[in-house]
Amino acid sequence: METEGVSPDSAAGRGPRPGETMETEGVSPDSAAGRGPRPRETMETEGVSPDSAAGRGPRPGETMETEGVSPDSAAGRGPRPGESVVKEGKASVLFPGANEVFYNPVQEFNRDLTCAVMTEFARETLAQRGVRIIVPGEKDRVVVSLTEEEKNGKETEQAEEERGETEGGTVQEERKQAEFKTAAVGERCEEGLCVLEGLAASGLRSIRFALEVPGLKRVTANDFSAKAADLITRNTHHNNVTHLLETQNRDASMLMYEARGKNARYDVIDLDPYGSPAPFLDAAVQAVSEGGLLCITCTDMAVMAGNSGETCYSKYGSISIKSRYCHEMALRIILHSLDQRANVYQRYIQPLLSVSVDFYIRVFVRVRTGQATVKNSASKQALVYNCVGCGAFHLQRMGKKTSQGKNMKYSAATGPPVGESCSHCGQRHQLGGPIWAEPIHDVEFVQKVLTAVSGNPSRFGTSKRIEGVLSMVTEELQDVPLYYVLDQLSSTIHCNTPSMLQFRSAVLNAGYRVSLSHACKNAVKTDAPAAVLWDIMRCWEKKNPVRRERLSETSPAFRILSTEPTVQACFDVRDDANPQSRKRHLTRFQENPQANWGPKARAKSGGGISSELEDKRKKFQGKRKSQITDSSQLKNFPCKKFRKGTCTHGDKCCYSHDAEQLEPGAGAQTP
């Protein structure tokens, strides 16, 4: 084929064929290439944006009303009629006025905390890859990795440095070159993290990752709803993060199952579903990379706090019980479930941060692989014996490990740790769990996040609250699961309540440790046994007597107060009884930010959301308590027995026998 004088485009069939002519005078290169109007076509471009002229706007002959509409809106990048713009952090997200996609502004704290944790995780992970992240408004910091491999390999690195000096300083030169690699916010980093948000809804969280977290290679925002996926795409263009963020319209579990290969795994997986994350946990523990980060939210707190223990077991493999420590127990239930599912694939978890705030819980865990470490998992889980009378609890480990020289022997634990009835009040025990009985925070990691947030307070809108919550987390006793509540101890024996400083001082004076808990305002987390706590309360009751004649002999209060204390409590206030977070007046427990601030209504699969929770609440309020007292009102309801043909009251029946109120096909009584 002769191609002399013929352009490659013509030879490829994209231009005029031999013998054909094309007038290009006054025609742009795009038009000549077939991307604009064809010959003899005209297109008015006066007042038309370049996007429209390039074929991304209306075609020739089409019209589009742009009066009062911004160019971005006309191009599909701005809000459409009826839509609003939600601004949070550095993101500006388009939001349908009809609330078709789930959005809850109260969870700004959740998203801020996630960005802070991800930033610190990226700092330490990318430091191993020779990349230093840059956070606006933050001073340069020395990075110390939290990985076990680096801690164990310090001596090896020092040996390599010494060897490098003798070989011409090769190691130092390579490290100097690596120090020049930086990753800034909003820039794509080839050595960076791959992030997945499995249930993205409007895409706000993913867009904030792209705009606020440095060191990212790719962010995948997925949602099963086609409307949500379309909105995510529009929001991606609206925030100019198309170079970092990609949209998927897939089932979250299938998307993660397809990423189980070592080279396809995600460094960070964020799951924030409506309700329980249980259906996604199995796929998540497989799709996260070695040492990767899982960020999980649970909003089904009614189930996890003890209202439906059987439902909790079906979802998480653990029975929840009603107790005052239910919020920390919920954290330990989800950690138990994650570790159990990871163990199936010879993997295990390392909790970095676990918080219970507002109406949900949020956990951040690293997932690692190791068959030997997985064998320890049984000894990390425990059953909970909870007294229904006085609230005393005891933990029973599921497994036991003993050291035999260089080897470890694993065996079943022995128990139970309690008798048939409570030794303090004589009541029975409830059995809950199993739960995660190891520390739920990595204090070293939390301290780094706290330092970064407090040193750059303008970065997040909820920085003060993050600082307060994380400060309390660092003050908690990490090796003490669960807690008591001071007002519950007083309520059990029907006496007035000592101040928190007095009670904490009494525990410290008795020779035990004590701390608060971020999960409950009046929590007492201590390694003191329940017997010591009740002795302290008995001593307090002697100073503030209770009228014994009003107590039943079978009540927990009577039995507890009938025993003389063996520990003489001292309630003199100590300086170390007041934690630093309390002295500094940090925002530890935030008041309700707005009316009806809890979880929003569930999104419908076909688009839109269900009725507002406030409307449902008004509709069903007092449904069980307000009984109908006027029997004449019962005539408004059909008789169920008449419908079945079994009513024997006839005309004297207080319910209606009107055939119109019956279901179709339900005949009347036969004589």
Segments the model singles out, each with a brief description of its role:
Residues 1-671:
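SAM-dependent transferase fold signal centered on methyltransferase-like domains
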